[in-house]
Amino acid sequence: MSAAANAEHGAADRVEILPVPGLPEFRPGDDLVGSLAEAAPWLRDGDVLVVTSKVVSKCEGRIVAAPSDPEERDTLRRKLIDDEAVRVLARKGRTLITENAIGLVQAAAGVDGSNVGSTELALLPVDPDRSAATLREGLRERLGVTVGVVITDTMGRAWRTGQTDFAIGASGLTVLQGYAGSRDRHGNELVVTEVAVADEIAAAADLVKGKLTAIPVAVVRGLRLPDDGSTAHRLVRAGEDDLFWLGTAEAIELGRRQAQLLRRSVRRFSAEPVPHDAIEAAVGEALTAPAPHHTRPVRFVWVQDSETRTRLLDRMKEQWRADLTADGLDADAVDRRVARGQILYDAPELVIPFLVPDGAHSYPDDARTAAEHTMFTVAVGAAVQGLLVALAVRDIGSCWIGSTIFAADLVRAELELPDDWEPLGAIAIGYPEQTPQPLGPRDPVPTDELLVRK
């Protein structure tokens, strides 16, 4: 039966939470089903048996011998956390928030030293859903009853202080009740409501089980939850769907590492306008690039007037066409080369970087004068790269085109700029045209022959 067949997970009636007292201190290899059948012969069809994962771990042999010395015990605990975790989401002090092999996100990969001997540590069950199914089938054979089973562990919750019990294993019930398409009593359609029923049961049962009561098992009675074949694994949100895939500090660190790799040359733009404050902010960040002699060797000219842009690009195209024709290229080849500049017409915004020699040192010889000019050119290049990256981290595309370098006098004349301002290309800016798959960070380039060591 599907979850949709059950219109409401709430009982709208009396629900009981019953303790299961008299259970022994479990050890590896103990018969958990037999102990439960003996302690709770009163189980009925439809009951939900809620079992603390520590009990399952003990019976399944997920107990590790540990030193009694606190420091040595903590060292082992941290090694076990590393072994159990597949990734670390966040760190705060010595606390690690991890994901384990079955996708559970919690502190310390579920490695725990509570409710075990002082020379032991407990690991989570390897497959809690399978453990739940085994318990359910065993009780059906021993007592002739059909129950649901939820295996629980204690975790914290995003946005909330404190911990509560969650379902990490389940069998024989609806673990997730969807209400999308249903209507409330006022006729309002429920759009995204989806209730983690198994988690609600886990939390409710903990009101009876507690932490210090020596009651590791409780029974929730009075719910009407059909077995839709789902398990607790369905409650695990995969990393790619998780809005909190990393902790804050880790997300910031990842963003810093990936910022450079987000930049790529975008040649097709959408018509969506780019907010002016975003461009201003990106330029401000770009201007923090290193520069010689504490100077400001770069100016970014933002060509905002459409008539000015068209006139400038038309004149550059005419000169470029004349130069290529003089080189002996045929008309088709000239057209193909000139067409590459169409991006500067089409981009929503156009910014031209200029080298400005303010503060450059003067030298009596050509060699040092040329070196000074090269130094300023490198500084402008650093600022240009900074601008491209600053745009990319805002999801704004860009493409650096070198054409203005070949028409410096023309560019200065059209934009009415001083004679010592040197254009160093042009930057087309805009939001990238939609693609079937969003473009993520690029892979770093192999350094095999490009990083020379001496």
From Swiss-Prot:
<feature type="region of interest" description="Disordered">
    <location>
        <begin position="432"/>
        <end position="454"/>
    </location>
</feature>
<dbReference type="InterPro" id="IPR000415">
    <property type="entry name" value="Nitroreductase-like"/>
</dbReference>
<feature type="binding site">
    <location>
        <position position="291"/>
    </location>
    <ligand>
        <name>FMN</name>
    </ligand>
</feature>
<comment type="pathway">
    <text>Cofactor biosynthesis; coenzyme F420 biosynthesis.</text>
</comment>
<dbReference type="Pfam" id="PF00881">
    <property type="entry name" value="Nitroreductase"/>
</dbReference>
<keyword id="KW-0342">GTP-binding</keyword>
<feature type="binding site">
    <location>
        <position position="402"/>
    </location>
    <ligand>
        <name>FMN</name>
    </ligand>
</feature>
<keyword id="KW-0436">Ligase</keyword>
<feature type="binding site">
    <location>
        <begin position="263"/>
        <end position="267"/>
    </location>
    <ligand>
        <name>FMN</name>
    </ligand>
</feature>
<feature type="binding site">
    <location>
        <position position="112"/>
    </location>
    <ligand>
        <name>a divalent metal cation 1</name>
    </ligand>
</feature>
<dbReference type="GO" id="GO:0046872">
    <property type="term" value="F:metal ion binding"/>
</dbReference>
<feature type="binding site">
    <location>
        <position position="115"/>
    </location>
    <ligand>
        <name>GTP</name>
    </ligand>
</feature>
<keyword id="KW-0547">Nucleotide-binding</keyword>
<keyword id="KW-0460">Magnesium</keyword>
<dbReference type="InterPro" id="IPR023661">
    <property type="entry name" value="FbiB"/>
</dbReference>
<feature type="binding site">
    <location>
        <position position="153"/>
    </location>
    <ligand>
        <name>a divalent metal cation 1</name>
    </ligand>
</feature>
<dbReference type="GO" id="GO:0052619">
    <property type="term" value="F:coenzyme F420-1:gamma-L-glutamate ligase activity"/>
</dbReference>
<feature type="binding site">
    <location>
        <position position="154"/>
    </location>
    <ligand>
        <name>a divalent metal cation 2</name>
    </ligand>
</feature>
<comment type="similarity">
    <text>In the N-terminal section; belongs to the CofE family.</text>
</comment>
<dbReference type="InterPro" id="IPR008225">
    <property type="entry name" value="F420-0_g-glutamyl_ligase"/>
</dbReference>
<dbReference type="GO" id="GO:0052618">
    <property type="term" value="F:coenzyme F420-0:L-glutamate ligase activity"/>
</dbReference>
<dbReference type="Pfam" id="PF01996">
    <property type="entry name" value="F420_ligase"/>
</dbReference>
<keyword id="KW-0560">Oxidoreductase</keyword>
<feature type="region of interest" description="Dehydro-coenzyme F420-0 reductase">
    <location>
        <begin position="248"/>
        <end position="454"/>
    </location>
</feature>
<keyword id="KW-0464">Manganese</keyword>
<feature type="binding site">
    <location>
        <begin position="23"/>
        <end position="26"/>
    </location>
    <ligand>
        <name>GTP</name>
    </ligand>
</feature>
<feature type="binding site">
    <location>
        <position position="58"/>
    </location>
    <ligand>
        <name>GTP</name>
    </ligand>
</feature>
<dbReference type="GO" id="GO:0005525">
    <property type="term" value="F:GTP binding"/>
</dbReference>
<dbReference type="InterPro" id="IPR019943">
    <property type="entry name" value="F420_FbiB_C"/>
</dbReference>
<feature type="region of interest" description="Coenzyme F420:L-glutamate ligase">
    <location>
        <begin position="1"/>
        <end position="247"/>
    </location>
</feature>
<keyword id="KW-0511">Multifunctional enzyme</keyword>
<keyword id="KW-0479">Metal-binding</keyword>
<dbReference type="InterPro" id="IPR002847">
    <property type="entry name" value="F420-0_gamma-glut_ligase-dom"/>
</dbReference>
<keyword id="KW-0630">Potassium</keyword>
<feature type="binding site">
    <location>
        <position position="53"/>
    </location>
    <ligand>
        <name>GTP</name>
    </ligand>
</feature>
<comment type="function">
    <text>Bifunctional enzyme that catalyzes the GTP-dependent successive addition of two or more gamma-linked L-glutamates to the L-lactyl phosphodiester of 7,8-didemethyl-8-hydroxy-5-deazariboflavin (F420-0) to form polyglutamated F420 derivatives, and the FMNH2-dependent reduction of dehydro-F420-0 to form F420-0. Is able to add up to six glutamates to F420-0, producing F420-3 as the major product with lesser amount of F420-4,5,6, consistent with it producing the polyglutamated F420 compounds present in Mycobacterium smegmatis.</text>
</comment>
<protein>
    <recommendedName>
        <fullName>Bifunctional F420 biosynthesis protein FbiB</fullName>
        <ecNumber>6.3.2.31</ecNumber>
        <ecNumber>6.3.2.34</ecNumber>
        <ecNumber>1.3.8.17</ecNumber>
    </recommendedName>
</protein>
<dbReference type="GO" id="GO:0016491">
    <property type="term" value="F:oxidoreductase activity"/>
</dbReference>
<dbReference type="InterPro" id="IPR029479">
    <property type="entry name" value="Nitroreductase"/>
</dbReference>
<feature type="binding site">
    <location>
        <position position="323"/>
    </location>
    <ligand>
        <name>coenzyme F420-(gamma-Glu)n</name>
    </ligand>
</feature>
